[in-house]
Amino acid sequence: YYVDNQPVVGERRIDGAWYYFNESGIMATGITVQTDRPDKVYYYDEDGKMHYGWKELDGKQYYFHPTLGVMLKGAERNIDGVWYYFNEDGVMATGWTNHHNHTYYYQNDGHMTYGEKYIDGYWYYFHERTGVMATGWAKHHDHTYYYQSNGHMYYGEKHLGNYWYYFKKGIGVMATGWTVQSEKPGKQYYYNDRGQMQYGWQAIGNDAYYFDKVYGVMKPYTFKNSNGYWLAYDRNGNLVKDLRSAFNNESSYVIKVNKPMNTVTVYMQYGDGSYTVPLVAFICSTGASTPTGTFYTPDKWRWLRMMGPSWGQWVTQISGDYLFHSVYYNSTNNNNSLSVSAYNNLG
């Protein structure tokens, strides 16, 4: 192209269209890098006109700025209300893509993915506004989820911070309230509204429940308040009178002796610190010499030599020479040394 008999070099607007002529005056077609703009790429059609918008080259999609004609490279672009990403070579991204320190997923048509997406056997979540792949905690569809560092939805138990959480199998929803883990049928757990596993005594509704202090499994009892005491009922609604097998490692107990009734009741501690949960009650021998008052047990023995000589098992000192102990045995460390008369006596 000549002007005043001189070849045009560089860009030139002719009849409303932009053209580019190299240093020899040859009109550019196809992919072109202008001499004075080495970091920018353009595309000129076969007739030399600058191209704008979408262009497929060798089976790949590119996009050229709608007014400047510059190829988009290493950038996001909202085109007709849809977000796309073009890599450093200007190729429209599809599939997994990392940029701006985040991970995204673009569909086959280049559209950015939002929300939940099932990809190659795993569920992922992409932020509804930004399209960023979720890792860690995420809330959507009125539920809470947890995604691993690779974006995979997490299922099952997980220890996060100082708490155990449970994410339901198959759907990944964080558990709250009463929960039976699919991996542990028959065992009940309770998670608060933040999803944290609960331990020990928990008041739920009008009743109370006890959850293992280490594993969080609910003991199979419902405790109901009766005149200030928490009585245990089994799953069939029957009153449970002996809880020793379920609560055998408490740190402290209160033992109350009812002298007129010749009974001993052992209480364990409730969640508020009061000793108001009957553990077990049994008959005992009492008399005028049985001391009254409040005592703290100073010592205990597995076997202890007593009068006779005879031997007592599971001996706890109450005060001075007053003890709680089994019926007497004729020798130590021998459960077979129990006499008939001793068997018929209360220790």
Where does each model-flagged region fall?
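Extracellular adhesion/carbohydrate-binding repeat motifs centered on closely spaced tryptophans
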Residues: 1-251, 308
